[in-house]
Amino acid sequence: MATTGTTVAALGSLSASAQEEAESGREFYELKRYILETEDQRTGLDAFLEDAALPALERHGYGPVGVFTDEEDISPVYVLIRHKSLAGVAEMIHILGADAEFMEKGAAFLNAPADNPAYARIESSLLHAFTGMPQMSRPSDAPGRVFQLRIYESPSVLTGQKKIEMFNVAEIDIFKKTGLNPVFFGEAVIGDKIPNLTYMLGFDSMDAQKAAWKTFIADPEWKELSGRPEYADDKILSGITNINLVPTKYSQI
């Protein structure tokens, strides 16, 4: 009975924590990765997202939605969806299912047969916004804008929290002042390569991206912060993934 009481108390604490997070304005981000095998699948996905999914998501308060891909390859396609709360993540599929316009315009994609699938697979991660940047930003509307998606893996949960602390304490501010314009920062709650944090940066151009990183690396505040023993990369990071992306013509970010 004592164990049950402890469990109930823990669940109550988690529920209270979730409510506090919702009230604090910290968003959740769903990062979907569509794996495609053919040009027809890419054409179908683009049509579904542009004509059905993005308009429906915007109608129900999930916008702006970002859609990104490699400039040269048809796959993968990344879709970034903003959620105001954890409940919104669970409710989204039911909200869209009750949207007649979405179901009608997305019918071909949603009902794709087994012998002609709409995609190979969908991979998805759920991210929780950092306290240092609780809400998404749209840093650029330039026609030639580019984005960087970066994933920092850590060797343990606590070292992962240390890297998040580093961002919240100062690194996010240093990013902003040196032209590394964040779209979001998120801690992976569900997904692969856990524990990890994931963030996205946006730039007017590839030249702007290169210039900003050069400025960042030379910044005195960054040198001081990264020189602190508790924030040494070899202690708190075990892998970094860097992905350069461009927005689709219908992306809202």
Task: For each feature predicted by the language model, list its residue ranges.
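Hydrophobic residues positioned within well-ordered beta-strands of beta-sheet architectures
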Residues: E30-K32, V77-V79, I122, Q148-R150, ...
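Residue-level recognition of alpha-helix initiation/capping sites
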Residues: A47-F48, M166
